[in-house]
């Protein structure tokens, strides 16, 4: 049996099903490119039948992202499968991922099908997909709650029909590691032909055991694990890819397995996904959380200073957390700026570099020292792939304990300056109302949050907010500035630009 574990990333499909997450096509392509750079083996780009937007995202990723298998999801029916192939056909390595539920509860209440009907549908779906491509993955939805004998019949039939990957999902996060490992082991011994295919698992985190269950499956023969960056996904999320990868890497003595992941890209990938989805990473999150390599207790600090391995089982550099001593400031030139960005893994076009350098110089006038975190924030803001319908020109605020908060905002559109003023329940509310007056939109802000990019009085504030115009589709906006209110205005304009761009497509 191969010692390689394939990494199947579903950030753009299952991950995007997280409540409040809505990515546009450009953002999905940007994440897909970074996933390819990270070294994932398969990117599940979306579910093409569900919407024109999903179809376009899968199609664009298939055309633009190279060196990786691109998968499209489809239910076990011909219409879904045909649509999936139409979207993914231009990929260098296309895969159709088709699924049907096998648990009695799903058969009775969702599908309203008999076991034999499900078996026939699975076989027909795999054959249809194989007519298009030699790479077909079959998933038995809710496998962990399925009758084992029936599940094995379906898996055997799917293999005989031509499936090359057999995925066994713990769809509702019901399994526990010891049980799940035995479950996978039993399937290996009961399903004819299973040695000819790659066995995969897709574990959810409802009981907090998605990563543990995935690793238990690997110990029992699974050679593909499915998950999402930062563990995002429906309900409590998916298995976190960064945690599975670093567990396999750090505990080679236990697993004796490897992946093709470039671990130094993990942190940058995590930050990109967090920035574009608006889902913040909890500070104590394993591997990529803000506190993952922080030591506050005096004994721990003393130990780490004397010898890092006393309290750190991973080197921060392994996952791409930089400890560079190079500090940039207002006297730093374009060459030093470009050099540092290249060291950090960013390769910008001349146009992007010029724009980013202008932002850097403006920030350097306000901050004495520019850190890597500041640079990352600048680049993330620069690389947002939405046309700037409106740009913030200026902002004046009047606020206080005895004054009604008032904001005067100036925006530019097509070179024309537009100004409006508004009062609000607070300065941020006043800013948003003034912007709505200019744009003619009536948006509702559903969340607002700020992170300090670095420490100190002159720290950059990174504001992330979510807005909706119809109560359904949510748009994430981000803005950075040393001024919290300016960052809020930038974030709101960013969200509004996304909304306008989406409505014009």
Swiss-Prot record:
Residues 5-267 form the Pyruvate carboxyltransferase domain. Its EC number is 2.3.3.13. One of its GO terms (molecular function) is 2-isopropylmalate synthase activity. InterPro entries: 2-IPM_HCS-like, 2-isopropylmalate_synth_dimer, AIPM/Hcit_synth_CS, Aldolase_TIM, LeuA/HCS_post-cat, LeuA_allosteric_dom_sf, LeuA_bact_synth, PYR_CT. It is an enzyme of class 2 (transferase). The keyword Metal-binding applies. Its main location: cytoplasm. It catalyses: 3-methyl-2-oxobutanoate + acetyl-CoA + H2O = (2S)-2-isopropylmalate + CoA + H(+). It comes from the Bacteria. Its cofactor is Mn(2+). GO terms for biological process: L-leucine biosynthetic process. Homodimer. This is 2-isopropylmalate synthase. The gene is leuA.
């Amino acid at each position: 049996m191969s010692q390689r574990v394939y990494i199947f990333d579903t950030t753009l499909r299952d991950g995007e099903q997280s409540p409040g997450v809505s990515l546009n096509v450009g953002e999905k392509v940007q994440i897909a490119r970074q996933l390819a750079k990270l070294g994932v083996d398969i990117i599940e780009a979306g579910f093409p039948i569900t919407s024109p937007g999903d179809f376009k995202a899968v199609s664009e990723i298939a055309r633009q992202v190279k060196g990786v298998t691109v998968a499209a999801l489809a239910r076990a029916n011909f219409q879904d499968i045909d649509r999936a192939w139409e979207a993914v056909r231009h990929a260098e390595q296309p895969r159709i991922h088709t699924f049907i539920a096998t648990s009695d509860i799903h058969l009775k209440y969702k599908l309203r099908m008999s076991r034999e009907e499900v078996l026939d549908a699975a076989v027909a779906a795999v054959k249809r997909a194989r007519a298009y491509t030699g790479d077909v993955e079959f998933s038995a939805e809710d496998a962990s709650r399925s009758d084992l004998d029936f599940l094995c019949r379906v898996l055997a039939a799917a293999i005989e029909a031509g499936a090359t990957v057999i995925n066994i999902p713990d769809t509702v996060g019901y399994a526990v590691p010891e049980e799940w490992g035995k479950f996978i082991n039993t399937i290996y011994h009961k399903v004819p032909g299973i040695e000819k295919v790659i066995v995969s698992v897709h574990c959810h985190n409802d009981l907090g055991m998605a990563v543990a269950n995935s690793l238990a499956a690997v110990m029992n023969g699974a050679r593909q694990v499915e998950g999402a960056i930062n563990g995002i996904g429906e309900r409590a999320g998916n298995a976190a890819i960064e945690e599975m990868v670093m567990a396999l890497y750090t505990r080679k003595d236990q697993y004796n397995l490897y992946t093709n992941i470039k671990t130094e890209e993990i942190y940058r990938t995590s930050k990109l996904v967090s920035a574009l989805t608006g889902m913040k990473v909890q500070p104590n999150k394993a591997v990529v959380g803000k506190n993952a390599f922080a030591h506050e207790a005096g004994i721990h600090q003393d130990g780490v200073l004397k010898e890092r391995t006393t309290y750190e089982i991973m080197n921060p550099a392994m996952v791409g957390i930089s400890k560079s001593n190079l500090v940039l400031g207002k006297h730093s030139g374009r060459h030093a700026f470009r050099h540092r960005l290249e060291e950090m893994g960013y390769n910008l076009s001349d146009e992007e570099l010029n724009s980013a350098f202008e932002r850097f110089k403006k920030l350097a006038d306000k901050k004495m020292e520019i850190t890597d975190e500041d640079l990352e924030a600048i680049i993330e803001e620069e690389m947002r792939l939405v046309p700037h319908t409106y740009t913030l020109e200026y902002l004046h605020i009047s606020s206080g304990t005895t004054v009604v908060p008032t904001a005067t905002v100036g925006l530019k559109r097509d070179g024309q300056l537009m100004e409006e003023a508004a009062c609000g329940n607070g300065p941020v509310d006043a800013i948003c109302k003034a912007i709505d007056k200019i744009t003619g939109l009536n948006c509702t802000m559903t969340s607002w949050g700020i992170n300090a990019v670095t420490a100190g009085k002159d720290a950059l504030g990174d504001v992330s907010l979510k807005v909706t115009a119809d109560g359904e589709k949510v748009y994430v906006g981000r803005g950075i500035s040393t001024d919290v209110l300016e960052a809020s205005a930038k974030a709101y304009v960013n969200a509004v630009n996304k909304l306008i761009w989406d409505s014009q497509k």
